[in-house]
UniProtKB/Swiss-Prot annotation:
One of its GO terms (cellular component) is plasma membrane. The chain crosses the membrane at residues 83-103, 119-139, 158-178, 182-202, 214-234, 241-261, 325-345, 358-378, 398-418, 424-444, 496-516. One of its GO terms (molecular function) is fluconazole transmembrane transporter activity. InterPro entries: MFS, MFS_dom, MFS_trans_sf. Glycans are attached at residue 486. GO terms for biological process: xenobiotic detoxification by transmembrane export across the plasma membrane. CDD domains: MFS_Tpo1_MDR_like. It is found in: Endoplasmic reticulum; Membrane. This is Transporter mfs1. Belongs to the major facilitator superfamily. CAR1 family.
Length: 531
């Protein structure tokens, strides 16, 4: 079965069995009897320059898809195969993202076990999220290398992620716990940095936004359900079982993606086709465009592309800088709430550890409701516009949905902060978090899609830089969250003024999508990176 053949399991079977994939050489127009004879000289060849491979000026045979309907092209896979891959990416993202928040219910027990203060233990959350920032700088560019692809990075990094949970669970000091948490964040990051790219590999542009929503739900569900599952482990067993559970869930994901997740990278699939043709014909001139481009990069240039370009884009491009700061703020609020929720619901409402884990469900409910609305918006507004204009319309129009979303964030913060008091039922502040879920979801969807449309040639670097700054901002937020809320009060609304500070900052950010909508085209015309 072709689906299993393209998975890691299929590749391992092929490697250890000594098998070689057969290529339909007549279909590709390959002359196999003499590797030095040009294709045009093969009288029985069905070669068609415009349909398949082309010979460039250097005599290299550029390997491409066999027309628009080539069945090996991921965009032409059957629907069931695309749905399986989508599920794999979403489940992988859910499991890895859960690793950050599953830690929080055990902070008190870890503090008591290791005889340290609260802030040093919170570093276990901070360093894990900081790993999200560092990982994409490494793994995102590697996933674009044709010889590597995405699949191997997913599997190998997840194996390391699983192994890191063992010393984390067995550790008896922060000297063990903290480095392991940071490394786990680094090796868990590929799903977060390239998951969207995997979906873009298989879905047509007008369908891609729909399935990005499901991936986003996986990204939301992980940190939302993490505290609940972590709390259950802390109550039933101990804080160490948070990491054993994370290891078991991740191991299940590893089994699934090993057997049921084929490679989706177009450049890697074409590279493997070119490699098979080289082996079959003995002609070394079969190359892909990506293979040629990557071979022209020196190690220094590749390192610069990985480490320097993302930072340059984030700092020098006004559009990227402003949206990165905005997204970083919204992302930070979620991790601030990992400290604010226990303060409010334990101090004011006297919730148990398990009940504290349940309060995050408001964010998940809000995200699901927003997805339903967003589907309607896509179907009625964006997709018809995309089809009518054949995908060619000002990128700034993608930001329209972010206009109301920008107001939802401060509304949520003021609502949550000042309704969290003993005289108000506990469900009321939770309802306030629904506005955050809706606002953050719509902001993330619109802003990331806009950045991809505005910087198509450098989208990997833009997203890597965004992940670096966004995750760094979020990583720092738990360290000052408890002090901010405890020191601002007041006692009858313990998260009131702290939420107000965040709400005011969010209000300052509201004009950003409006300004980019108005001036974005002019800014892009002056940029050497944007289109």
């Amino acid at each position: 079965m072709w689906f299993l053949r393209e998975t890691i399991f299929g590749e391992l079977v092929e490697y250890f069995s000594g098998g070689t994939r057969q290529v339909d050489v007549e279909k590709l127009g390959v002359c196999t009897d003499n590797s030095n004879v040009e294709l045009s000289s093969c009288p029985d060849s069905s070669f068609d320059d415009e349909k398949t491979n082309q010979v460039n000026s250097e005599g290299l045979i550029i390997v491409t898809w066999d027309g628009e309907d080539d069945p090996e092209n991921p965009k032409n896979w059957p629907l069931w195969a695309k749905l399986v891959v989508t599920f794999d990416v979403c489940f992988l993202t859910f499991a890895v993202y859960m690793g950050s928040a599953i830690f929080t219910p055990g902070i008190q027990e870890i503090r008591e076990t290791m005889h340290v203060g609260t802030v040093p233990v919170i570093l276990g959350l901070t360093l894990f999220v900081e790993g999200y920032a560092v990982g994409p700088l490494i793994f995102s560019p590697l996933s674009e290398v044709p010889q590597i692809g995405r699949q191997k990075i997913y599997v190998l990094s997840l194996i390391v992620f699983i192994c890191l949970q063992i010393p984390t669970a067995l550790g008896s000091s922060l000297g063990v716990l903290l480095p392991m948490r940071f490394l786990a964040g680094v090796f868990g990051s590929p799903a977060l940095s390239t998951g969207g790219a995997s979906l873009a590999d298989i879905w047509q542009p007008w369908l891609y936004p729909y399935f990005m929503c499901f991936w986003s739900l996986g990204a939301v569900g992980g940190p939302v359900l993490g505290p609940l599952l972590g709390a259950a482990m802390v109550v039933a067993k101990s804080w160490r079982w948070q990491f054993w559970l994370l290891m078991m869930i991740s191991a299940l994901v590893l089994v699934i993606i090993t057997f049921f997740m084929p490679e989706t990278s177009e450049w890697h699939l074409l590279y493997k086709r070119a490699k098979r043709l080289r082996e079959l014909t003995g002609n070394p001139n079969y190359k892909t465009e990506a293979e040629i481009a990557s071979s022209q990069l020196s190690k220094g240039q590749f390192a610069k592309q990985i480490l320097v370009r993302p930072i340059i884009l984030c700092v020098s491009e006004p559009i990227v800088l402003s949206l990165t700061i905005y997204i970083g703020l919204v992302y930070s609020i979620l991790y601030l709430w990992f400290e604010a929720f226990p303060i409010l619901f334990t101090t004011v409402y006297h919730f148990t550890t398990i009940e504290n884990g349940l309060v995050y469900m408001g964010i998940l409910v809000g995200s699901v409701l927003t997805v339903a609305f967003y589907f309607i918006y896509l179907r009625k507004v964006m997709i018809p516009k995309f089809v009518e204009n054949k995908g060619k319309f000002p990128a700034e129009e993608i930001l329209i949905i972010s206009f109301p979303a920008a107001f939802f964030i401060p509304i949520s913060l003021f609502w949550f902060g000042w309704t969290g008091r003993e005289s108000v039922h506990w469900i009321v502040p939770i309802v306030g978090t629904l506005f955050y879920a809706s606002g953050s979801f719509l902001l993330f969807q619109s802003m990331f899609q806009y950045l991809a449309a505005a910087y198509p040639k450098y989208v990997a670097s833009v997203f890597a830089g965004n992940a670096l700054f966004r995750s760094s901002m979020a990583a720092a937020s738990p360290l000052y969250a408890r002090a901010m809320f405890n020191n601002t009060g007041p006692s009858y609304a313990p998260v009131g003024w702290g939420s107000t500070i965040l709400g005011v900052i969010s209000c300052i950010m509201i004009p950003i999508p409006f300004l980019i909508y108005k001036w974005g085209l002019k800014l892009r015309s002056r940029s050497k990176y944007a289109t």
